[in-house]
Amino acid sequence: MPQLDTTTWFITILSMLITLFILFQTKLLNYTYPLNALPISPNVTNHLTPWKMKWTKTYLPLSLPLQ
């Protein structure tokens, strides 16, 4: 079984790390960052129908009447 032969592990792991390091560097160097990030004001919408109480009522175990 070749997995149990640990003589090639160091070379395999080292080559993998070097390859990933080079790939990540090229990916990060090719990324173009935006020049100016200006804040955009969000559009606020007013809803005409408010929440109805039957949908916002919470039932906590301690607030229920005792039986």
From Swiss-Prot:
Subcellular location per the Swiss-Prot or TrEMBL entry: Mitochondrion membrane
Pfam families in the record: ATP-synt_8 (PF00895)
Key word Mitochondrion present: yes
Residues recorded as bearing N6-succinyllysine in the entry: K54
Membrane protein topology class: Single-pass membrane protein
MF GO annotations: proton transmembrane transporter activity
Modified residues (N6-acetyllysine): K54, K57
Residue ranges crossing the lipid bilayer per the database entry: 8-24
Alphabetized UniProt keyword annotations: Acetylation, ATP synthesis, CF(0), Hydrogen ion transport, Ion transport, Membrane, Mitochondrion, Transmembrane, Transmembrane helix, Transport
GO biological process: proton motive force-driven ATP synthesis
Superkingdom of the organism of origin: Eukaryota
InterPro entries membership: ATP8_mammal, ATP8_metazoa
GO cellular component: mitochondrial membrane; proton-transporting ATP synthase complex
Major localization class: mitochondrion
Functional summary from the UniProt entry: Subunit 8, of the mitochondrial membrane ATP synthase complex (F(1)F(0) ATP synthase or Complex V) that produces ATP from ADP in the presence of a proton gradient across the membrane which is generated by electron transport complexes of the respiratory chain. ATP synthase complex consist of a soluble F(1) head domain - the catalytic core - and a membrane F(1) domain - the membrane proton channel. These two domains are linked by a central stalk rotating inside the F(1) region and a stationary peripheral stalk.
Subunit structure and binding partners: Component of the ATP synthase complex composed at least of ATP5F1A/subunit alpha, ATP5F1B/subunit beta, ATP5MC1/subunit c (homooctomer), MT-ATP6/subunit a, MT-ATP8/subunit 8, ATP5ME/subunit e, ATP5MF/subunit f, ATP5MG/subunit g, ATP5MK/subunit k, ATP5MJ/subunit j, ATP5F1C/subunit gamma, ATP5F1D/subunit delta, ATP5F1E/subunit epsilon, ATP5PF/subunit F6, ATP5PB/subunit b, ATP5PD/subunit d, ATP5PO/subunit OSCP.
Membership in a protein family: Belongs to the ATPase protein 8 family.
Protein name: ATP synthase F(0) complex subunit 8
Lineage: Eukaryota, Metazoa, Chordata, Craniata, Vertebrata
Designated gene of the protein: MT-ATP8
